[in-house]
Amino acid sequence: MQFAKRLEKIPPYLFAEINRKREALIAQGVDIINIGVGDPDKPTPAHILQAMREAIDEASNHNYPPYEGTQEFREAAVKWMERRFGVVDLNPNTEVVSSIGSKEAIHNTFLAFVEAGDYTLIPDPGYPVYRTSTIFAGGEPFTMPLKAENKFLPDLDLIPEEVARKAKMLWVNYPNNPTGALATLEFFEELVAFCQQHSILLCHDHAYSEMAYDGYKPPSVLQIPGAKDIAIEFHSLSKSYNMTGWRIGFAVGNAYAIQGLSQVKTNVDSGVFKAIQKAAIAAYNTDEVELQAVMSVYQNRRDIIVKGLQSLGWPIEPPKATLYVWVPVPPGYTSTEFTTLLLDKCGIVVPPGVGYGVSGEGYFRIALTICEERLHEAIQRMQDAGIRYS
């Protein structure tokens, strides 16, 4: 028995050593504070649970769902896109498809459009799935560095013309994981123009569209005139509605891109349980006041972490979106060295920035997914251990 050669190209799990040490410390009785995982700790809102309970009792929901999602779900997604972003004239029959979360749809889009010899343009640092899915599809990832001096936006001028000519897809994710960076409509206009010029499929991973603070509302790339000619956007209910385990979302945009994604999906999965789609419809009709109440919890946690780190000398500002704070490591450390120090000295688990790509070196990521008391305790442990930025 032998693994396929493609697995040899998949990088090893970069956090394996940290996980090994974490388990060893837990076995020794050490109280570990894990702020490394972007998995919301709050329950799914009650009205979504109620919609699920009612849908489970309907026998008509117990058989196979439509591959592309129920008509009701796709229409709800279209209405939400119009209500939330002002994106109109989306066709629920040809420009929307349900997905099992967004990770599945992201991966299957690579399989639909990338072949051997094709480039994919992916952000670095970025969601690791962009790179691994490129490799699974037989393509070649070309990384676009995200640098602080460019507000963690890719510089399109740095993409060589010979690479752009062979590129099939360009991936962006704003609000951004792991950096928390934002994109403006003006930047989206640049992306659309670049992808139109080079006949590249523009893919926007919008998993954090509702995870925003201080009154900020992240835009959709589909707000740009002409974007639907070359763009597809991926939405997920996982983070915004505390539904990571439910595995539900949708892809929306260019009809040809949706067709390609759907063709892969119909051959590898059987859709999303119809009762979960009913619950998702309830989620997309969540009252804005209730949604903002959820966001206020994460905003408060953000403020605890940012103020705490500032008190220890860190030169950081509060991010306006996502579940994360992207933090520079103190001078003299690599990201892996510093995250190992936090684990050994403080019992704090955070991922090193290099785990998200070589351009993530020099940073680590904090997830705002544990209670306020434990966040305060994490800062206190760092202070007690004498860990400061400078």
UniProtKB/Swiss-Prot annotation:
SUPFAM superfamilies: PLP-dependent transferases. Pathway: Amino-acid biosynthesis; L-lysine biosynthesis via DAP pathway; LL-2,6-diaminopimelate from (S)-tetrahydrodipicolinate (aminotransferase route): step 1/1. The modification N6-(pyridoxal phosphate)lysine is found at K239. Pyridoxal 5'-phosphate binds at Y67, S102, K103, Y127, N177, Y208, S236, L237, S238, R247. It catalyses: (2S,6S)-2,6-diaminopimelate + 2-oxoglutarate = (S)-2,3,4,5-tetrahydrodipicolinate + L-glutamate + H2O + H(+). InterPro entries: Aminotransferase_I/II_large (IPR004839), DapL/ALD1 (IPR019942), LL-DAP_aminotransferase (IPR050881), NHTrfase_class1_PyrdxlP-BS (IPR004838), PyrdxlP-dep_Trfase (IPR015424), PyrdxlP-dep_Trfase_major (IPR015421), PyrdxlP-dep_Trfase_small (IPR015422). The keyword Transport does not apply. Its cofactor is pyridoxal 5'-phosphate. Keywords: Aminotransferase, Pyridoxal phosphate, Transferase. Substrate binds at Y13, G38, K103, Y127, N177, R365. GO terms for biological process: lysine biosynthetic process via diaminopimelate, diaminopimelate-aminotransferase pathway. Belongs to the class-I pyridoxal-phosphate-dependent aminotransferase family. LL-diaminopimelate aminotransferase subfamily. Involved in the synthesis of meso-diaminopimelate (m-DAP or DL-DAP), required for both lysine and peptidoglycan biosynthesis. Catalyzes the direct conversion of tetrahydrodipicolinate to LL-diaminopimelate. Homodimer. This is LL-diaminopimelate aminotransferase 2.
